[in-house]
């Protein structure tokens, strides 16, 4: 089958920068999905995304769908003809529905008799007929929360669309998409090349735009050019290092078709303002990269990326310097003003701010968190007074001018202002660390005071919201409780804190008077333990290992984690699958025979067969060895030791009839199996692990 390259380009007004890459990815995926569903063969797929265009190129796209063999079964032969051999209504009706005559049907033999069948080959549709509808559907399915109309058309898109390329080889596909007539003409840079440019073939697309149109259409190429240019400029002009935030880099890439980095300067006096405030101002409002020296100290420099090659770059730089100066002046003013009021004097200002209608104000939450943080601090051998103080001050920076203007600085400015007020160093740090980790893989609190406040704040939210029956749903999690749960688990595990979730949640529950749900603490603990699954999935630990531990519901995260690591190590042992299978068999037997009512005291006088005597002796020997390991939380060593039971367990099941006729013998054997299983259950339910076969 012949192949040619295909190109679609949608020319628009400037697309939302944060949406550009997701739109491009979704557009590409939609076209690929459509081709796969249509059964059209294709080669490499390339995406292009710039401020005024979305494009996809498909290499080696087949010129048609493959022909398809079709088989349609009709009536049974005995129902197709009457006694005289004439076609029945069943046969003629079937043939008529297909637009054929009965003599065009074949006979198919099956185990249920002979049937008439129509066999034919459906010709595949030409690709040029398929692509317009496929592109239209891909565009309609893009994740656009708010679409707009323009002109007299009813067509909707995220921004007005002005031109369209649909090329297959060197031929334009003449079929409208989004009420636009396709062509082979694109448009260059809005200022450097404000005219139409002919794209002869799909292979010429980005070359024409780059060489004639002053447009780098490839998002990844443009992104790396900006990264390299910004880094080189910082080193060349200032001997410094540009700090490149990846999200900002994506946004700047989406704003520029022809990026040109330029360096500007601001007054040294602004460096007296915390660097985070300067960075936030430059990043959020102006999309500037900041520059640091070899010691990572901020320099009074910034790098902006212009979307054109100016004849007078100094004018562009000067313009940007004039724009940033008022922004930085505002930050300096906020910083100076905020420091005139101590954080403790702002506590009363938290009372009008609602946390949640039923759970009260931010002030109410602060009081609860302070009480809980104090208890947590005591439990982790930290200073409870510092934790209580930090929790009461934790949200006070929310009412400062700086944080009201730059919300991403919450906690960060709290630390600066607390230090300015002369608060204890750990208290000041805790005001920032309360929000850690802010995202997956983020840093954790470095101080125990910070750990106590971070955990207390999250647990208070979890218990409060679950307690008024407002847990997260499948689509809504407005208070980010999933992230809060994972944050608590990470802090406890990675900082190795001896905390029990059940206890902490019960402490939190005691601080509320408005909860309506029963067993809130246990419900929250179950929810948090369920979050462990995603935590371990990211680490490549299989679900069965998590489920084996989860079945025992250990409520100390550190203990839970040690068990998971131990079971994961046990799973790699050669004895693991056999012992998992044996545990599953034992579990089934015990469940059928009464489960919890079965004891585990073995009467050696009732042991008859050599295999059960050996197993009983080995189980008792292992019990003496592993019980101290359990007490120390050394689950890995315990499971490694218990792996030696594989051989006597296998022999027992090969040679011993558990369900003996004699009640006493039978019950004794059940007790032996129960004792065996309970040893493993001290760690996890390994019957849930994969078994041999």
Swiss-Prot record:
Database matches in InterPro entries: DALR_anticod-bd, Gly-tRNA-synth_bsu, Gly-tRNA-synth_heterodimer
Positions of region (Disordered): 65-84
GO molecular function: arginine-tRNA ligase activity; ATP binding; glycine-tRNA ligase activity
Record's GO cellular component terms: cytosol
Compositionally biased region (Basic and acidic residues): 65-74
Subcellular location: Cytoplasm
Alphabetized UniProt keyword annotations: Aminoacyl-tRNA synthetase, ATP-binding, Cytoplasm, Ligase, Nucleotide-binding, Protein biosynthesis
A Pfam cross-reference name: tRNA_synt_2f
GO annotation, biological process: arginyl-tRNA aminoacylation; glycyl-tRNA aminoacylation
Presence of keyword Heme: no
Record's catalysed reaction(s): tRNA(Gly) + glycine + ATP = glycyl-tRNA(Gly) + AMP + diphosphate
Keyword Nucleotide-binding among record annotations: yes
EC number: 6.1.1.14
PANTHER family: GLYCINE--TRNA LIGASE, CHLOROPLASTIC_MITOCHONDRIAL 2 (PTHR30075:SF2), GLYCYL-TRNA SYNTHETASE (PTHR30075)
Similarity remark: Belongs to the class-II aminoacyl-tRNA synthetase family.
Subunit structure: Tetramer of two alpha and two beta subunits.
NCBIfam families from the UniProt entry: glyS (TIGR00211)
The protein's name in its UniProt record: Glycine--tRNA ligase beta subunit
Organism: Marinobacter nauticus (strain ATCC 700491 / DSM 11845 / VT8) (Marinobacter aquaeolei)
Top-level taxonomy: Bacteria, Pseudomonadati, Pseudomonadota, Gammaproteobacteria, Pseudomonadales
């Amino acid at each position: 089958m012949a192949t040619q390259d295909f190109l679609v380009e949608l020319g628009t007004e400037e697309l939302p920068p944060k949406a550009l890459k997701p739109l491009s990815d979704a557009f590409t995926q939609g076209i690929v999905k459509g081709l796969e569903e249509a059964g059209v063969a294709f080669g490499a797929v390339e995406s292009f995304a710039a401020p005024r265009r979305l494009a996809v190129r498909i290499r080696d796209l087949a010129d048609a769908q493959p022909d398809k063999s079709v088989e349609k079964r009709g009536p049974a032969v005995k129902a197709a003809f009457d006694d005289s051999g004439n076609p029945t209504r069943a046969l003629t009706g079937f043939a008529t529905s297909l637009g054929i005559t009965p003599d065009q049907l074949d006979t198919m033999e099956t185990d249920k008799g002979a049937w008439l069948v129509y066999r034919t080959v459906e010709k595949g549709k030409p690709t040029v007929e398929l692509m317009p509808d496929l592109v239209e559907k891909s565009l309609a399915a893009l994740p656009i929360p708010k679409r707009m109309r323009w002109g007299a058309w009813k067509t909707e898109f995220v921004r007005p669309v002005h031109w369209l390329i649909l090329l297959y080889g060197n031929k334009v596909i003449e079929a409208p998409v989004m009420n636009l007539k396709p062509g082979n003409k694109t448009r260059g840079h809005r200022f450097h090349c404000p005219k139409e440019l002919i794209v002869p073939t799909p292979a010429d697309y980005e070359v024409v735009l780059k060489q004639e149109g002053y447009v780098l259409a490839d998002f990844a190429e443009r992104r790396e050019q900006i990264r390299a240019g910004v880094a080189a400029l910082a080193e060349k002009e200032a001997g410094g290092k540009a700090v490149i935030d990846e999200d900002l880099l994506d946004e700047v890439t989406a704003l520029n078709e022809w990026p040109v980095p330029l360096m500007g300067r601001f007054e040294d006096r602004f460096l007296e303002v915390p660097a985070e405030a300067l960075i936030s101002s430059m990043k959020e409002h102006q999309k500037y990269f900041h520059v640091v020296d070899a010691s990572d100290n901020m320099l009074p420099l910034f790098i902006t990326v212009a979307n054109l090659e100016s004849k007078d770059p100094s004018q562009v730089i000067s313009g940007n310097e004039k724009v940033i100066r008022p922004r930085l002046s505002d930050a300096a003013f906020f910083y100076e003003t905020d420091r005139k009021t101590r954080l403790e004097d702002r506590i009363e200002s938290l009372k009008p701010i609602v946390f949640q209608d039923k759970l009260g104000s931010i002030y109410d939450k602060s009081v609860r968190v302070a009480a809980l943080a104090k208890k947590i601090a005591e439990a982790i051998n930290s200073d409870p007074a510092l934790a209580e103080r930090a929790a009461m001050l934790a949200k006070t920076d929310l009412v400062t001018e700086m944080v009201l203007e730059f919300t991403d600085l919450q906690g960060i400015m709290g630390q600066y202002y607390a230090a300015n007020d002369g608060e204890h160093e750990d208290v000041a740090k805790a005001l920032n660390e309360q929000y850690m980790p802010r995202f997956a893989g983020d840093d954790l609190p470095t101080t125990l005071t910070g750990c106590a406040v971070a955990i207390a704040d999250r647990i208070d939210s979890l218990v409060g919201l679950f307690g008024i029956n407002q847990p997260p749903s499948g689509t809504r999690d407005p208070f980010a409780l999933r992230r809060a749960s994972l944050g608590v688990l990470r802090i406890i595990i990675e900082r190795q804190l001896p905390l029990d979730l059940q206890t902490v949640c019960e402490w939190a529950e005691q601080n509320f008077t408005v909860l309506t749900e029963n067993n809130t603490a246990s419900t929250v603990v179950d929810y948090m333990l369920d979050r462990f699954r995603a935590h371990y999935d990211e680490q490549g630990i299989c679900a069965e290992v998590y489920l084996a531990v989860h079945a025992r519901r250990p409520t100390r995260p550190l203990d839970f984690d040690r068990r998971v690591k131990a079971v994961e190590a046990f799973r790699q042992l050669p004895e693991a699958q056999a012992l998992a299978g044996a545990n599953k068999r034992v579990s089934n037997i015990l469940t059928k025979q009464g489960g919890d009512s079965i004891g585990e005291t073995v009467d050696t006088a009732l042991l008859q067969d050599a295999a059960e005597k050996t197993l009983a002796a080995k189980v008792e020997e292992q019990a003496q060895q592993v019980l101290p390991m359990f007490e120390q939380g050394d689950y890995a060593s315990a499971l490694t030791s218990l792996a030696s039971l594989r051989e006597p367990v296998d022999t027992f099941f090969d040679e011993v009839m558990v369900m003996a006729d004699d009640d006493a013998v039978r019950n004794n054997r059940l007790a032996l199996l129960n004792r065996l299983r309970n040893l493993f259950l001290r760690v996890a339910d390994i019957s849930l692990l994969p078994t041999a076969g």
